[in-house]
Amino acid sequence: MSNILRRGRLEAAPDEEILRYASSMETDRWIFSADIAVDLAHTVMLKEQGIISAEDCSKILAGLLKIREEGMEKLDFSYEDIHISLESRLIDMVGEDVGGRMHSGRSRNDEVATCIRLTLREELLGLLEEIFALRKTLVSLAEKHTETLMPGFTHLQHAQPTTLAHHLCAHEAALGRDFDRVQDAFSRVNLCPLGAAAFASTGFNLNRKRTQELLGFEGLLENSMDAVSSRDFLIECASVFSNLMINLSRMAEELVIWSSSEFNFIELDDTYASTSSIMPQKKNPDTAELMRGKTGVAVGALMSLLTICKGLPLSYNRDLQEATPNIWRSVETVRASVRVMEGMVRTMKIHPEVLSAQSVTGFTTATELADTFVREAGIPFRTAHQIVGMLAREGEKPTIEKIDSVAEIVLGESLSSRGLTEKMIKEALNPVSNIKRRKIEGGPAPEEMQHYIGRQQTELELNEQEIATIKDSIDSAFEALLEVVDEYRKV
């Protein structure tokens, strides 16, 4: 059978190399189900608008359901994309006089834009669920470790004591913003371009609101030229994915470092480790290392999308075909990474005794000692900073005598003469006292962390409800679509 797309305008068929070069069929596997759904909704609307007969509608719907049942492998991969291949298969089944009417009032331009949005919408919903699961795991783990001391770091140097709960919740907070960004992107993805046709809409009396409703979209992309030519939603999602992967990469880096012999803060479960082909004692954190590497997939996809979309005149250009594979690669990598990270965190073995012992290494209580000088001796913080810095340089344990000696050099008087006592110094140098004192909002004090964790658990419950509401809305729309398809098919 001749190519239903080329036979009118073009005489020569493309050779095999051009077919391979121009074809998107392999990538279009991502949108097979979406394309069937779009065809079903469009056909229903055509019938309701009186553009096709009830009998033709019935045959087209039956054919589409059969194609869905057969799967994509039954399609002809010699076509340049899934849309023409699917339509060709339909025409083979029901004849051109019937199947050839399905594309009335429609272009591949609005069709593919709708398919991409439908598929990406599902991927974003799945990603929201996966980020939610990771955040929930982090919060649950933090709840068990509000009093587990550990060193906090700046520049990867021991800085101040904190708790494991405080550290875990820092990652959860970043992931919470990632969750919000995915939600925001979802709101702009969940818009329907169908009915825009090539770019100038159509003279057929289409009901765009009806197909929007049947496909469960929140609203329309109203301007028909914008509807088919915009891929800013892909760029936005790729940016969100890149940000998320960078946050995951930071977590992965910490897991690599923390599981090393030098740190020994944690041990990864064997599931997430590998060994050496020559060194039998090795337990390598390969999964976490791969996650660092796979961050490049997401960042690279963003760069590709920006480069492809730059400088394209309105409206549709074939360059956009090269944009779509990047988003599928990115979202596939990101979703897998979130799932894997959740598993690594949930199953890792924590060494609280090592964390606690390391919490005071490197004079981590120095800041609290300086703060104590300010509070108890009434000196300026910058002066206290100088005194403690000199003590740190000498490397000796701060005692009241040593502190007074340095203070005499800096101030010309002792701090004990200004009310500082040995008891105050001991309390300042105690990491537990350090943590308990830091009870302002967002601090690591156990009491404050318990309040924070409670607030995060409430937020997670709300997030779970939000996801369920969106899914229910989309599921209801597709149930309604299938019900009307079943009704019209029986005519």
UniProtKB/Swiss-Prot annotation:
GO terms for biological process: arginine biosynthetic process via ornithine; L-arginine biosynthetic process. This is Argininosuccinate lyase. It catalyses: 2-(N(omega)-L-arginino)succinate = fumarate + L-arginine. It is an enzyme of class 4 (lyase). Pathway: Amino-acid biosynthesis; L-arginine biosynthesis; L-arginine from L-ornithine and carbamoyl phosphate: step 3/3. Its EC number is 4.3.2.1. It is found in: Cytoplasm. Its main location: cytoplasm. The keyword Disulfide bond does not apply. Keywords: Amino-acid biosynthesis, Arginine biosynthesis, Cytoplasm, Lyase. Belongs to the lyase 1 family. Argininosuccinate lyase subfamily. GO terms for molecular function: argininosuccinate lyase activity. Pfam families: ASL_C2, Lyase_1. InterPro entries: Arg_succ_lyase_C, Argininosuccinate_lyase, Fumarase/histidase_N, Fumarate_lyase_fam, Fumarate_lyase_N, L-Aspartase-like. GO terms for cellular component: cytosol.
